[in-house]
């Protein structure tokens, strides 16, 4: 295994002239010419720079206030300017030259590198890039072999082989040391990426340590073939591998006169096939149409006052149209795309819940709206100093949980999608009839859901399609809860011959930038739908189109499942496509 190496000295035999060269080169330093120790000299010039800068800015402000010409300079100001220039020259000379030299390096002869121990140590101690291959055939210090001219390759081969064998033993030993440290608890597992500088190596070491601690094998969990650098600090902490979920394609879905191939990541048999059948029925009937009703993400902080009267005063202030422009100005400065749309308040005793709604461009927008809300809370603190902010989220938002406020007011994208399915398509493709579908929809999705006390669940299986598309497209799977709020309506039209079907989904929460959308697999699925990344024309159309595609896919899934139920095909199809025959055979044996 490849690990981050310490400066390798064991690969060089003792007594070689490299050591003497290293000692000679390090005997004299530029800092030896300074009258004070290096840290004191640096501290002195830093203090001088900031002190003189503060003095000059203070004098400049006084001159502007007193209408004194800026070119009139006193003796103290002249001395301050001289000290400022001197400190700038020193700091640039001390820090700037070294930085420039690190960017523009000469190309030394390859044989000079072989005779320079410092060059070998510098290359060997350099951190390998994140997600580099975990099995490395050559250690970093052997990369210099590539720079050796062809005529010297034979003379260099023996040195390469000797160093390779020595380094391999060191790598294994260091890997074992790190694993033992993680198992013993002396090295925190979460710090491996920062300590090693190699995300793939960190995942491999963490994985091995976990297996030793638990005594359980992770052989079936893949490790290689994933870009762990892409999730660092963004998608997942302390990774030990990745889970594989198959992706199927349903479609083409003909929506708003455009065809889409819908990626669905699922482990449920029949789901993709059923949705695909619904897409076929919609396509054969002329396609579906969707309309975006609302587009606004919400966040609702909770604050507390000493009395209900004070809480009501803030409520009236926030809901007063005269104050909206000021609040929007404060809110909008947190982002180029976040624009405040409205504030709705609710009181519970002396506690006030403020539900902010804002547009978020092509992002799902939770972080964006949270930053804007924080700006408004800081602003309100000036006029309401007795306001005690209890939490940036008070569950009046409401995120990742079923809530009537989302069902009624909406959250994210509110979409309605409809289609008229022709009578012959219902019979030939869906294997049922219009009257049976309409009656079953009333009994199951409307009356049955009401009997169950459903909240936003007036549908057959909207969450099945939403979850599958969300996983494939890099959305937050937990937001499937409110995103699956859906009411499915069916009605006989054209003298009872054709079927009008619609789905109304008030809180589809999607984005095409940020989060899991930047991962390679999920990005490819978004690209398939034509909604990858942010729109170049204006903020928002990609995420709104993705929400419409989700609603159209749900429409297809609802149509197919309800037809299977009406025709009595559900059990038969699941026994054929959704059984684990391998597990059954094992149990029978």
Swiss-Prot record:
One of its GO terms (molecular function) is hydroxymethylglutaryl-CoA reductase (NADPH) activity. PROSITE patterns: HMG_COA_REDUCTASE_1, HMG_COA_REDUCTASE_2, HMG_COA_REDUCTASE_3, HMG_COA_REDUCTASE_4. Its EC number is 1.1.1.34. Glycans are attached at residues 256, 332. It comes from the Eukaryota. GO terms for biological process: coenzyme A metabolic process; isoprenoid biosynthetic process; sterol biosynthetic process. It holds the Pfam family HMG-CoA_red. Residues 1-35, 101-544 are lumenal. InterPro entries: HMG_CoA_Rdtase, HMG_CoA_Rdtase_cat_sf, HMG_CoA_Rdtase_CS, HMG_CoA_Rdtase_eu_arc, HMG_CoA_Rdtase_N, HMG_CoA_Rdtase_NAD(P)-bd_sf, HMG_CoA_Rdtase_sub-bd_dom_sf. It is found in: Endoplasmic reticulum membrane. The active site is at 268 (charge relay system), 400 (charge relay system), 476 (charge relay system), 574 (proton donor). The chain crosses the membrane at residues 36-56, 80-100, 545-565. Keywords: Endoplasmic reticulum, Glycoprotein, Isoprene biosynthesis, Membrane, NADP, Oxidoreductase, Transmembrane, Transmembrane helix. Belongs to the HMG-CoA reductase family. This is 3-hydroxy-3-methylglutaryl coenzyme A reductase 2-B. It comes from Panax ginseng (Korean ginseng). The gene is HMGR2.
């Amino acid at each position: 295994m490849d690990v981050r190496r310490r400066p390798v000295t064991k690969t060089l035999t003792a007594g070689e002239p490299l050591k003497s060269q290293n000692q000679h080169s390090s005997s004299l330093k530029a800092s030896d010419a300074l009258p004070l120790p290096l840290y004191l000299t640096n501290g002195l010039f830093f203090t001088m720079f900031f002190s003189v800068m503060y003095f000059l800015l203070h004098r400049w402000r006084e001159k502007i206030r007193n209408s004194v010409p800026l070119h009139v300079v006193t003796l103290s100001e002249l001395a301050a300017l001289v000290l400022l220039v001197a400190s700038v020259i020193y700091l640039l000379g001390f820090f700037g030259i070294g930085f420039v030299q690190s960017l523009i390096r000469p190309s030394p002869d390859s044989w000079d590198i072989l005779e320079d121990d410092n060059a070998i140590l510098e290359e060997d101690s350099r951190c390998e890039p994140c997600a580099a291959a975990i099995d490395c055939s050559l250690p970093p210090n052997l990369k210099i072999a590539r720079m050796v001219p062809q005529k010297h390759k034979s003379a260099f081969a023996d040195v390469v082989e000797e160093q390779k064998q020595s380094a391999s033993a060191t790598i294994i030993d260091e890997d074992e040391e790190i694993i033992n440290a993680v198992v013993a608890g002396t090295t925190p597992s979460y710090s491996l990426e920062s300590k090693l500088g190699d995300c793939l190596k960190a995942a491999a070491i963490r994985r091995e340590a976990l297996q030793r601690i638990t005594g359980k094998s992770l052989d079936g969990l893949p490790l290689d073939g994933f870009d762990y650098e892409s999730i660092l600090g963004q998608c997942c902490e302390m990774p030990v591998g990745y889970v594989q979920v198959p992706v199927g394609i349903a479609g083409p879905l003909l929506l708003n006169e455009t065809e889409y191939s819908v990626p669905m990541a699922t482990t449920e048999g029949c789901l993709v096939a059923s949705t695909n059948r619904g897409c076929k029925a919609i396509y054969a009937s002329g396609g579906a149409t969707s309309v975006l009703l609302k587009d606004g993400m919400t966040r609702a902080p909770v604050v507390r006052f000493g009395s209900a009267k004070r809480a009501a005063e803030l409520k009236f202030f926030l809901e007063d149209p005269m104050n909206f422009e000021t609040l929007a100005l404060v809110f909008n400065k947190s982002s180029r795309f976040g624009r405040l749309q409205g504030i709705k308040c609710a009181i519970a005793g002396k506690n006030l819940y403020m539900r902010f709604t804002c547009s978020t461009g092509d992002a799902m927008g939770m972080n964006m709206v949270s930053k804007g809300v924080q700006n408004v809370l800081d602003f309100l603190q000036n006029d309401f100093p007795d306001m005690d902010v209890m939490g940036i989220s008070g569950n009046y938002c409401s995120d990742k949980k079923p809530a009537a406020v989302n069902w009624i007011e909406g959250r994210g994208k509110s979409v309605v999608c409809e289609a008229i399915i022709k009578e012959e398509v219902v019979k030939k493709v869906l294997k049922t009839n219009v009257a049976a579908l309409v009656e079953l929809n009333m009994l199951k999705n409307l009356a049955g859901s009401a009997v169950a006390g459903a909240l936003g669940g007036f549908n057959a299986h909207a969450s099945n399609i939403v979850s599958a598309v969300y996983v494939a497209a890099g959305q937050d799977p937990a937001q499937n809860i409110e995103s699956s709020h859906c009411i499915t309506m069916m009605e006989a039209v054209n003298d009872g011959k054709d079927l009008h079907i619609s789905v109304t989904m008030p809180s589809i929460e999607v984005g095409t930038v940020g989060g899991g959308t930047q991962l390679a697999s999920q990005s490819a699925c978004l690209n398939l739908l034509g909604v990858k990344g942010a729109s170049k024309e204006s903020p928002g159309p990609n995420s709104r189109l993705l929400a419409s595609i989700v609603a159209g896919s749900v429409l297809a899934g609802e149509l197919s499942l309800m037809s299977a139920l009406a025709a009595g095909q559900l059990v038969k199809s699941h026994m054929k496509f959704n059984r684990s025959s391998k597990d059954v055979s094992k149990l029978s044996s």
